[in-house]
């Protein structure tokens, strides 16, 4: 689905908010350290990556509403294709934790959060070309305590 400019910017803002919230949640669960918390922490990390990629989709005027559509977006937009292997690794780790009840250790969460940072670094430059206010939005979100 194609978005008009106002909806695109609103989508960028919403997805960046979800990105920041999921990173913060993953970090909180990591600090908790309980086995179930660690499994959900890698899932939150995956969803952080998903939302920063979807912020880019929104900036391009494209609404992605499923994982399948997300895969098509990667194929149709090679400028962000470098993100796909890292994104896919996060997705697989999340699915292992959620669907197969695979045990996670703190280092798995730390690795997942590093992968999220890699996705952010790769996507933000592209995102700012289409939504120059994205960095300001992200800075404001990170500077605001979220509860």
Residue ranges and their predicted role:
Residues 1-147:
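Terminal alpha-helical segments
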